[in-house]
Amino acid sequence: MGVCIDGASLSIPDVVRVARRAAPVSLSPDARRRIDRASAYVDTLLRRERPVYGVTTGFGRFADVVISPDDSATLQRNLLLSHASGVGELLPDEVVRAILLLRANALSCGYSGARAEVVDTLIAMLNRGVHPQVPSQGSVGSSGDLAPLAHTMLVAIGEGTARYKGEVLPGAEAMARAGIPVVALRAKEGLALINGTQVMTAIGSLAVHDVSILAQVADIAAAMTTEALRGTTSAFDPRVQAARPHPGQAASARNLLRLMEGSGIRESHRNCPKVQDAYSLRCAPQVHGAARDAIEYARHVVEREMNSATDNPLVFPED
């Protein structure tokens, strides 16, 4: 099953399918129209020669330095080259794939000003298995994953290195072998490619998915322990959960009852005179439920972030 990105509806399961199972990716027609509109507006700003951060000016401390339209493409290319300064072990290919997907989705919001050609290139890299080599250390966090995103995007412009069909190659060669034309960046596009939180969001997406599985495994372990110790399921009664209605607790209790449904061991001691089980058994839903609630909170934060535009500046085309 493929994943169609539109800048608004991407989910953690979508990220997992693309990152780990190589699900094909496409761009929605509505997203393409938004992208084209914002890109055209950047061209308009460039012609007006108005001071726009990162478009007609330098970056950071050089924000007051005026850049001529003739130099805008060089400015964007140099931005990627200068920020590719990461160190440390390389990120796994599955994380790099998630990064490419999330940055393409962020650009699809239509507030970045990059052309659809840039997004199409990132999607082609995903679909054809071109995986940039990205050092794991160097992000500045809330100000953006500038360094790791720069390493990721270098390959799109024919620089850096990438893994393609198991072989690590110069970026230009990897793109050529995959049959993907490299991008000649235009105004705003280098900044649009690296000014975001997609590296931390990619790692967070996969982590939330994996820890959700661990929450299920924890319930299985609790159910097996209750069975082995001939415990009672009375503490998992829905009425108990309704009296203290934390969502995660109720979900864990329901799961425990489902896991032990029809158990011969459970039936054999249904009328056992024991008053209650050990705390570690009867309070499993409360403990596991707190973890479930935390995971659900993280899920909402990550999915909200992955469907957000994180650029500076944002582009709001004039009506």
Predicted feature locations:
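N- or domain-start disorder-to-order transition segments that initiate the globular core
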Residues: 1-49
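Disorder-to-helix initiation segments
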Residues: 1, 182-207, 272-288, 319
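Acidic, low-complexity proline/glycine-rich segments
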Residues: 2-12, 175-195, 255, 259-270, ...
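Short, hydrophobic/aliphatic alpha-helical segments
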Residues: 31-51, 121-136, 178-183, 188, ...
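Accessory "access/gating" subregions that flank catalytic or transport cores
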Residues: 226-319
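Active-site cavity-forming subdomains of large catalytic enzyme subunits
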Residues: 84-92, 96-246
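Glycine-rich loop at the start of a catalytic domain that most often binds anionic cofactors/ligands
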Residues: 61-76
